[in-house]
Amino acid sequence: MTRVTMDQDTENKVLVIKNMDSGYLVAGEQVTLEDVSYDATEPLAEDELMVQLLYATYDLFKRDLASSSADATELRGRKPVETMSIAQVIKSNNKQFQEGDMVIGRLPVQQYVLIKADDATELKLLENPCEFDDIRLFLSVLGVPGLLAFSSLYEIGRPKKGETILIAGASDEIGQLVGQMARLEGLKVFGSVESDEKLDFLITELGFDGGFNYAKESPYEALPRLVPNGIDIYYDNLSWMSRLNIGGLDTHFDLLGSRHLNAAFSSMRRYGRIMFYGTIAEQTVLDPIIGMFLHNTVLKRLTIRGFGLSDPSFGKKWGKLHMERMQQWVKEEKLKIPTFEITGMDNAAKAFVEAFYSSENTHTHTILAVT
């Protein structure tokens, strides 16, 4: 490790949200960098440590923002952006962490972060038994996104060889991972995306059997064409986006989620499984639709279940197997993890906006390399 020499003049910038409810996000306006004043030479209190941020990802921050909880409301106020990050300990007065240790956890997007004693318990040492050179994997397939995709597919989807899965909103990191895992289990995999470029990427690079561009083709037309014999698993990865309420995305994804769900119901086979991340949009279950919704559920003996990573039967239950199997698949190069990296703290706001508006970018896992 290169030792960082810090003094009172050491630059320390933090990414701050000013206002996320005033139209499309623009780097430098709603999301900006601010200077953080601190004395880096001051001794650390007991159990405190100082870390230098290396990598941050905004993808899961979007899902936090889409939550209907009070915490998500607080995220919209003027405050530092906090997200899953990898950092290196550069100074420690905590017995659990030594100088040079790599740690992972939810941190502010800030060059240098003083971790108070109470917050230190939320950090974890970055364990890398397979000695992967690319530690960014622990923010994607080997981290929370991978665990979310893995636990939901196996806990609810219960994939069986020969079945068919449809992933609505398959172009983001979760959708890509679910599709690749389903393919490894011998399923026929179809996905919906927002551009021809992303559809081509899913098919040619990730091995999807097919899909459709929902900007050009309605799911009511696409599903009979793609899956005339029906689908066994429907993975709703669109409806949660209706909670974003950013730059018109709420209305856009609300309508898309409704149309996908209604079309999927008509194509579900008996004993099919339907899963939703977080919360579905209100318009998805309006009164005119709910009768059909319930009728098909009973008629086709469907299982419908929402999920969140904190549920006991998800992250906690599947954590060990997720890490074992995912590491093996990564070592065997059976999974592709497309990553779009933006380098430098000065580009932190740009990377944040890119995570929300990435229609031109097929590599939808956006990573900020701080140093």
Swiss-Prot record:
Enzyme class: oxidoreductase
Binding site for NADP(+): 172-175, 198, 214, 237, 277-283, 307-309
Keyword Ribosomal protein: no
Recorded metabolic or biological pathway in which this protein acts: Secondary metabolite biosynthesis
Pfam families listed in its UniProt record: ADH_N_2 (PF16884), ADH_zinc_N (PF00107)
EC number: 1.-.-.-
Gene Ontology terms for molecular function: oxidoreductase activity, acting on the CH-CH group of donors, NAD or NADP as acceptor
Keywords: NADP, Oxidoreductase
Keyword NADP: yes
InterPro entries linked: ADH-like_C, ADH_N_2, GroES-like_sf, MDR_fam, NAD(P)-bd_dom_sf
Biological role: NADP-dependent oxidoreductase; part of the lna gene cluster that mediates the biosynthesis of diastereomeric piperazines. Lna and lnb clusters encode sets of enzymes that produce overlapping sets of previously undescribed metabolites such as piperazinomycin-like metabolites or morpholine. The lna and lnb biosynthetic pathways appear to be part of a signaling network that controls the formation of sclerotia, a resilient overwintering structure. One primary function of the non-canonical nonribosomal peptide synthetases lnaA and lnbA consists in the reduction of L-tyrosine.
Protein family membership: Belongs to the NADP-dependent oxidoreductase L4BD family.
Protein's recorded name: NADP-dependent oxidoreductase lnaE
